[in-house]
Structures are given as C-alpha cells and as structure tokens.
C-alpha cells in the first residue's frame, strides 16, 4: 500500500446475487472507469468464495471482515477515513454500478478545495449523505477535522450507515463539500426517474403537478441537505453510462451484463 493511494470502497456480506454479482461487475468496471484507483471490497465470512475469486481476478483488493451484527458491514467501506495512507476514497454500493457520469463528477471535485464530495442524481436521494455516493479527501479532512472512526458494531437496521453519517460526518462537512445534484441544478424535462421504493409515490411522480412537487414540496422536505452557500453543481458532460440512467440506481444483475473494457 503506497502513501497517497486512491480507493473505491464497497461492503459485501451475504449471498444475494444483487450485491455479490454486482460487486463482481463493479470490480470489472473499476478497471475501465477508474484505472488508476484501487477497488477495495470489505467482505464478510458469509460471502461465497466463487464471487470473491472473481472480484480478485479483476484485480480488486479484498479485505475479509467479521460481521458482528445485522448491518454493521455497511460501515466497513468507511474505514479508509481513519487511514493516513489514503489520499482520496469514494464509497459506493455494490447493487449500483460505477459510471462515467460519476467519474467526471469525482474529477471535478478533486480539483476543488473541498474535503468531501456528495452525489444526488434521483429524487429519492434525500439523506444528508448518501452512504454509497460520497467521497473524502483524507489529506484535507485530517488537517481540518482530525481522524474519525465510523465503525458501528451495533448497527441492526438497514439505514444505520446513513444515520451515523448524518450524526457524525455531516456536521463536519456540511459547509465543506462539493455536491453534484441533478435535481437542484436542472430544469425538469420529461418524466423523472423512478424505481420501486422511492419516497415519491408513482402517481405523484408522473402525475399533474410534478414540477411543483419536485421543486417546492420535495425541496422543503429536504432543506437540511441544502445548507446556505453550498457548492452545488450540475453533473459534467460524460460518456454514456453502461448501466442504468442515474448514479446510484439499483441494477438487477439478471437484466444486465458487464460491458467490455474500452480501449
């Protein structure tokens, strides 16, 4: 491990193909989209070895971890925050896919003087920090705030990782981040993205009053994520996405196949 390394981090536990096959595909995509970065997967003891071998075969790094609770594994991907050997790291979800859309946004953030990077690309991205859509410049973070441990061995519910980020990390980076936010910086054109589980009801998402709902009602509900003076930007231009239509979208591994690396 070299001083100044850059990491893409994932947590992986259980045997659900949504996450396990997604991890394999992200290990492959990382070679193409982030060739100078290291993809690191924090994996639990219950992940099938066949998936782990495929991840390693794509050149990714595997760190084996012991799961203590139902969802403590979600926080493993935050461990580089306390490392003095890592410069930049970005936390991602195994059930979504790396893309050129996010890579160009990451590059833009890296040119800034902000310690953190946030992404919001769908109207249900309403947490202050989306656990699989943020990054940290450790050099700046450590200089300004010191070292922070975000492990949570007691995590026993699905959103525990995002709750902890809101309680411990958000107060520090609330005024020290770049946020690439599609909905904050774009006029609504056509229909918004929608996936099962969105907090925006299907009928509201596609019905009359859509523009008001997204621009006014949702904004009021989520005003905490828009602090005064926030460095918020539209996503920069990018090459086509290989999977999905927005960053952070859940991708069903049975419906998509991994793309071939570009020359």
Question: Could you say what each language-model-derived stretch is?
Answer:
Residues 94-96:
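Short acidic donor-binding/metal-coordinating loop in glycosyltransferase active sites
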Residues 124, 137-252:
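Catalytic core and acceptor-binding pocket of nucleotide-sugar-dependent glycosyltransferases
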Residues 1-67:
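N-terminal anchoring/stem segment of glycosyltransferases
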Residues 101-126:
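Conserved donor-nucleotide/metal-binding helix-loop-beta segment in metal-dependent transferases, i.e.
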Residues 69-75:
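A short, glycine-/small-residue-rich helix N-cap motif at loop->alpha-helix starts
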Residues 89:
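Short aromatic/hydrophobic "clamp" motif used to bind/position activated sugar donors
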Residues 256-263:
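Conserved small/polar residues in nucleotide/adenosyl-binding loops
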């Amino acid at each position: 491990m070299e001083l100044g390394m850059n990491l893409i981090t994932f947590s992986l536990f259980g045997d659900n193909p949504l996450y396990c096959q997604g991890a394999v595909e992200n290990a492959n995509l990382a070679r193409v989209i982030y060739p100078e970065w290291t993809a690191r997967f924090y994996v639990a003891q219950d992940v099938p070895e066949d998936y782990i071998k495929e991840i390693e075969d794509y050149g990714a790094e595997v760190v084996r971890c012991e799961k203590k609770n139902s969802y403590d594994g979600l926080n493993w991907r935050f461990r580089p925050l306390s490392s003095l050997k890592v410069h930049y790291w970005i936390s991602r979800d195994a059930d979504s896919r790396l893309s050129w859309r996010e890579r160009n946004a990451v590059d833009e953030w890296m040119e800034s003087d902000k310690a953190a990077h946030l992404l919001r690309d769908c109207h249900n991205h309403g947490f202050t920090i989306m656990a699989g859509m943020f990054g940290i410049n450790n050099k700046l973070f450590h200089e300004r705030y010191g070292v922070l441990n975000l492990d949570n061995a007691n995590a026993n519910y699905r959103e525990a990782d995002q709750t902890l980020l809101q309680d411990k990390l958000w107060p520090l980076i609330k005024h020290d981040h770049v946020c690439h936010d599609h909905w904050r910086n774009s006029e609504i054109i056509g229909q918004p993205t929608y996936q099962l589980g969105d907090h925006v009801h299907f009928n509201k998402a596609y019905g009359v009053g859509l523009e008001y709902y997204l621009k006014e009602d949702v904004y009021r509900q989520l005003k905490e994520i828009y602090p005064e003076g926030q460095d918020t930007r539209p996503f920069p231009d990018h090459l086509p996405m290989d999977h999905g239509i927005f960053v952070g979208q859940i991708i069903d591994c049975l419906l998509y196949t991994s793309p071939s690396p570009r020359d």
